[in-house]
Amino acid sequence: MIGLPNGARVWLACGVTDLRNGFDGLAGLVQTKLAEDPFSGQLFLFRGRRGDRVKVLWWDGDGLCLFAKRLERGRFVWPQSTSGTVHLTAAQLSMLLEGIDWRRPRRTHKPEFAV
């Protein structure tokens, strides 16, 4: 993934979004539904109805960037709320994009005794 700029905030848009929206449609949703400025340099995440696709909208200072990801297996973990936003850290964003439950990360392997 492209590195996040220092101080960039990450916002997850709760609920389902029509991912047929592109740059302008998602920027409009950021303004109307989330009451945020899409040109602020913050990242805005949207999830589709099936839960296996997300789009990330981000202003990099020169123009809007739109990133998309589709999981081949599983679904992206999303809040149950149907409206509003959730703030994520960069680490939580990385986990989310890998398909990991960012709300309750767990070890997959417990360390054993060192020999």
Regions found by a protein language model. Give the residues of each.
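Polybasic/polar functional segments that serve as interface/processing modules
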Residues: 1-115
